[in-house]
């Protein structure tokens, strides 16, 4: 298989894993595009993306335009004379002129089985919706948002123990393998492009902190899915005793209750059971303000009086 001259475009750690796979392959990465350096941390110091750091460490030219809509940036990209552009969580829109510039166009690695979850948060939305599987799709990019023809798909079962953090890690391992397979298939002409079924498409909206507020008027099953989806960010929470209490781990209890949603049914070192609109949710790991996440046994040792049975937890949706 003849080596390809590749432009790579990506920004976060998830993308850097794919760049590393390309660097380890026989292909040539001739240029890297990534988002401009951003202020980060308490000191708001300008910080390079993980992709930029990896590219610099490997002496690969780095390009950080604020947009690819302007002609000078487009001409600069065209001058690289790439065979293909690989895009992974880049964060900038690619206009048609850019998509058409490389000989083989632009391909994207997306963290879901398309067309199920298009958009910014496919890993989180799969958990949020209670999906039984997820995976990676490599697609030929077009001007739409994750609407291009699918070149290769891999699947992965979603376990009850999975959170967004664990799925992210699994897909960050699966994605680079799929990418290299897709590049080989493109060169060999063995990939059959598959159109997406628009009727099956959903948009995976970005998560918000407000959305992470636990609404006890939902079912225990839905809240369990949300807690897993919002771990590690923005982290599910509820207001109680004037404090925001984060919830990192829960499970659906076999206990039944007719108590009003948000009512504590029981509190022991095994968990705090809370009534919901449908079923009972057991809180297993929580975080008090300014503290580290703790198992419920330690929370009760510190603030047991907050979680007495029959206490009603705050809920703005009451």
Swiss-Prot record:
Its EC number(s): 2.1.2.9
Origin: domain of life: Bacteria
Pfam family, one: Formyl_trans_N
Catalysis: reaction(s): L-methionyl-tRNA(fMet) + (6R)-10-formyltetrahydrofolate = N-formyl-L-methionyl-tRNA(fMet) + (6S)-5,6,7,8-tetrahydrofolate + H(+)
Amino-acid positions noted as binding (6S)-5,6,7,8-tetrahydrofolate in the UniProt annotation, renumbered to this chain: 112-115
Keywords assigned: Protein biosynthesis, Transferase
GO cellular component: cytosol
MF term (GO), any: methionyl-tRNA formyltransferase activity
Enzyme class (EC, first level): transferase
Family from the record: Belongs to the Fmt family.
Function (record text): Attaches a formyl group to the free amino group of methionyl-tRNA(fMet). The formyl group appears to play a dual role in the initiator identity of N-formylmethionyl-tRNA by promoting its recognition by IF2 and preventing the misappropriation of this tRNA by the elongation apparatus.
Protein name: Methionyl-tRNA formyltransferase
Organism, as annotated: Shewanella baltica (strain OS195)
């Amino acid at each position: 298989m003849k080596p390809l001259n590749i432009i790579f475009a990506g920004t976060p750690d998830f993308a850097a894993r794919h760049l590393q796979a390309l660097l380890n392959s026989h292909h040539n990465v001739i240029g890297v595009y990534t988002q401009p350096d951003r202020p980060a941390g308490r000191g708001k110091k300008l910080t390079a993306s993980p992709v930029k750091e990896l590219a610099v460490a490997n002496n690969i030219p780095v390009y950080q335009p604020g947009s690819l809509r302007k002609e000078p940036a487009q001409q600069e990209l065209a001058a690289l004379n790439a065979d293909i552009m690989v895009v992974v969580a880049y964060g900038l829109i690619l206009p048609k002129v850019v998509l058409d510039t490389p000989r083989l166009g632009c391909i994207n690695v997306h963290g879901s089985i398309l067309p199920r979850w298009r958009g910014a948060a496919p890993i989180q939305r799969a958990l949020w919706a209670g999906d039984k599987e997820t995976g990676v799709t490599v697609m030929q990019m077009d001007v739409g948002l994750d609407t291009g023809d699918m070149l290769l798909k891999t699947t992965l079962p979603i376990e009850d123990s999975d959170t967004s953090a664990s799925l992210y890690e699994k897909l960050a391992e699966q994605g680079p393998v799929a990418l290299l397979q897709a590049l080989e298939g493109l060169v060999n002409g063995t990939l059959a492009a598959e159109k997406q079924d628009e009727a099956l498409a959903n948009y995976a909206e970005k998560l918000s902190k407000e959305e992470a507020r636990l609404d006890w008027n939902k079912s225990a099953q839905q809240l369990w899915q949300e807690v897993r989806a919002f771990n590690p960010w923005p982290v599910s929470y509820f207001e109680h005793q004037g404090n925001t209490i984060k919830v990192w781990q829960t499970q659906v209890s076999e206990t039944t209750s007719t108590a009003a949603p948000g009512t504590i049914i029981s509190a022991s070192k095994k968990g705090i059971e809370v009534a919901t609109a449908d079923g009972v949710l057991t809180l297993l790991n929580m975080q008090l303000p300014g503290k580290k996440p703790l198992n419920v046994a330690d929370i009760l040792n510190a603030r047991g009086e907050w979680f007495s049975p029959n206490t009603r937890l705050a809920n703005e949706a009451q």
